[in-house]
Amino acid sequence: MRPAQDNQGSFLGRISIRRNQFVDVNNEQEQEDLELFQKHIADRFTELLSPPQPPPSDEINTVASVAATEQIMSVTWLRKLMDVFLCCEAEFKAILLMGRDPTQISKPPFDRLVPEMLDRSIKALDICTAVVNGIDSVRHYQRLAEIAVTALEQRPLGDGNVRRAKRALANLVVALSLEDKENVSGGGGGGGGGNKTTERSWSFGRRSGGSSAASKGGATIGQLKSSSWAVGRNWSAAKQIHAMTANLTPPRGNEAAGLPQPMFIMSTVMVFVMWVLTAAVPCQERSGLANHLPVPPKHLNWAQSLIGIHEKIGDEWKKKEKKGSAGLMEEMTRMEKLGHSLMEFADGFHYPAEKDAAESAAVQVAEMAEICRRMEEELVPLQQQIREVFHRIVRSRAEILEVLEQAGKVSAPVV
């Protein structure tokens, strides 16, 4: 899969000329950097908004149509979204930190904006943890679908094969329609596979810094050498996302032309990406997220495609919320439809199968098999990318805290 790097290489190459030099950043140069950053954001999300469309069904068979994997919310698309986030984050960090006097980001309004951004990053870590756990549930759905496919591919197709497929399909359909908390926390009804979100955690280490400077972003610098992250039983994705949007407002006046602007953009991108992930897979307590995610003003050019993606996903989420859904991942949505259709075939099956019904079912089984194949290839790499996002956020947060500590030492009075 081609990373969504765009012009990042040339941008970072040029900006790194100022690496390790504490100089006054030229205003004209900074404006050019900010404009490039906004352009790259717009370009990357435009590509995500308009993925290649599958060919008309009259030109290719159904299975080949399913192979067009880059639709919004497909596993392949979600992997591209992770690449986009990582590219945006790297470019933003270059703007924020490279060659900048550390005391600059400790002064107003950054003494407020930076801690708020660091606090959002902590909440994003929780969401990454929950989403990786949710993908484990999706892999369980995949296994149920594979059982049904294997049974229905047998020739000649007998009553025993159909009964085996029917049991797997029944569990699959129930799992895919469970409400969020049931699906992720409970693991009941054959849907969650005993997945215990409350027991999953990651640990990460930070270098110990000085003991004097403190961060309003959630931790004293150097206070903890390691932290453990786990999603509790009463944890709520909706509350987490809403908390991330607190105080997330576009900069005004002079701030709109300076560093607060990319800070707002990156925070918006982070919240949006976490919102998409919670929509895609089983995740605890998502009630209301389809309607209440704040989006940036439409007059901002960099935000147009992001808003377009938000609207597409939000509309689909509202439909699914009414009847209950484990997630909006494209493969899961298609799997649910095929599961219902194959259940109808199994309910009406009598040996020997009617020719037309058997042929129609065979096409659907082949499509289900293709979905399972894609999941087998893509779900684990998606989990790995989300872990990479997690650790990138951890590293960037530590680097920003380090810069704040340096600023504290520089500004401390000499005794």
Swiss-Prot record:
Q: How does it sit in the membrane?
A: Single-pass membrane protein
Q: Does the keyword Zinc-finger apply?
A: no
Output compositional bias ranges, type Low complexity.
200-219
State the deletion phenotype. Answer: Reduced pectin deposition leading to reduced seed coat mucilage thickness. Characteristic pattern of pectin deposition to the corners of seed coat volcano cells.
Annotated region Disordered: the residues are 184-219
State whether keyword Calcium applies.
no
Q: Where is the composition biased (Gly residues)?
A: 185-195
Key words, A-Z: Cytoplasm, Developmental protein, Membrane, Transmembrane, Transmembrane helix
Q: Which tissues is this protein detected in according to the database?
A: Mainly expressed in cells expanding in a polar manner such as pollen and root hairs.
GO-annotated biological processes: mucilage biosynthetic process involved in seed coat development; seed coat development
Which InterPro entries does the UniProt record give?
A: ROH1-like
Q: Can you cite an annotated GO cellular component?
A: membrane
Origin, by domain of life? Answer: Eukaryota
Q: Where are the transmembrane segments?
A: 263-283
Compartments it resides in: Membrane; Cytoplasm, Cytosol
Function, as annotated, reads: Required for seed coat mucilage deposition.
Q: How does it assemble?
A: Interacts with EXO70A1 and EXO70C1. Binds to EXO70C2.
Q: Quote additional remarks.
A: 'Roh' means corner in Czech.
Write out the similarity annotation: Belongs to the ROH1 family.
Q: What is this protein called?
A: Protein ROH1A
Which gene name does the record give? ROH1A
